[in-house]
Amino acid sequence: MRFSIRRFFSAASGGAIILLLSALLGLLLSNSFLSESYFKVLHLKMPFSALDDAPNLAEFISIAPMSLFFFVVIAEIKEEIISGHLASFRRVILPLISALGGMMIPACLYGLITSGHLEVSRGWAIPIATDAAFTLPIILALGRHVSEGARVWLMALAIFDDLLGIVVIALFYASHLNGYALFAAGLITAVMIGLNKKSVQNLWVYASAGVVLWWALLVSGLHPTIAGVITGLALPSVADQPEKASPLERGKQIIAPWVTWLILPLFGFVSMGMSLSAMSFHVLLAPVPLGVALGLFLGKPIGVFGATIMATRLKIATLPKGTSLRMLFGLSLLCGIGFTISLFIAELAFSGSDFLVPAKYGILMGSLLSALAGWLWLRFLKFPAKGV
């Protein structure tokens, strides 16, 4: 790994503060005397004449700049698998199993709570994600209360969570498909794979192909953020000269600061825009917000911790060094902080629907409860170095 874990967490901490402040600003403006102007700007239609239903500004931010976010995510995953903390099966298996458990149980819990309401079934994936941008800085602030091995486990789990979230978006949140555009997207992808096989090092060739791919995917009906994923996978991870950085590393170095300091805060500012005037216990106990909130606050830790216990008891994997099950339970509580990806999936599932704002209520409620419970558990309980 090119950077220390502490440096990685420190960068995440600074970005999380800006993201949180931006989200709070969006929430404040949407509940102030400026709310009408705020929502009017967000609903401005973008000039995409090739599309029957052109996206508004808020939707455009979710499909264009966020493509760069997914590029950075897949670049991180690729680097970790090739030469980082996910480079061996032994290191991969426990966080992968934990992430799968943390995906299935929240989705099932949401489905159970919303059963009988088919119109909200598309929201099943909202509580499956863990937001590393908020989770990692919290455990950095906890310092010695969380072992280095546990931090690495959580980082790997968050990476797999993002990867699984990308797969879910690609498979379950496509709109009506355009065969010609889909064929064009497949052709561009094949060209990019060919460039990789030829070890073409020119970063801008891939960037240009990625932009065309993004447009083809947008027209095709598949979610265009997948273009960021494909571009990240296509970029060579090895340079043609030892003293040079690889195209993948150069691309990440260029884009990552923009994602951290501009794109994610902009997304938070736009996505957290919702009126709180309708919030009440009656509204919060409706199927959608309750399903999302409990999916995050209960489903996430049950799924993550349950899968971790199963993997260790069956001797499929071992606990990280210096880590106990009680410590991992506290971290499992923090996994219920779902913000960026949860909001993103909520926008996909309920765009233009009356269920979007209640879903955001659920994300806010579940994430706050998870953060508070995880912090208190890890801050005030004492953990042995081994055992439970």
Swiss-Prot record:
Topology of this chain in the membrane: Multi-pass membrane protein
Keyword Cell membrane: yes
GO BP, one annotated term: regulation of pH
Transmembrane segments: 8-28, 57-77, 93-113, 123-143, 152-172, 175-195, 210-230, 254-274, 278-298, 328-348, 361-381
Secreted listed as a keyword: no
Reactions catalysed, as given in the entry: Na(+)(in) + 2 H(+)(out) = Na(+)(out) + 2 H(+)(in)
Molecular function in Gene Ontology: sodium:proton antiporter activity
Principal cellular location given in the protein's record: membrane
Highest taxon above the source species: Bacteria
Signal sequence, start to end: none
Gene3D superfamilies, A to Z: Na+/H+ antiporter like domain (1.20.1530.10)
Cross-referenced Pfam families: Na_H_antiport_1 (PF06965)
Entry's Gene Ontology cellular component terms: plasma membrane
Compartments (UniProt record): Cell inner membrane
Keywords, in A-Z order: Antiport, Cell inner membrane, Cell membrane, Ion transport, Membrane, Sodium, Sodium transport, Transmembrane, Transmembrane helix, Transport
Family label: Belongs to the NhaA Na(+)/H(+) (TC 2.A.33) antiporter family.
Biological role: Na(+)/H(+) antiporter that extrudes sodium in exchange for external protons.
Cross-referenced NCBIfam families: NhaA
Name of protein: Na(+)/H(+) antiporter NhaA
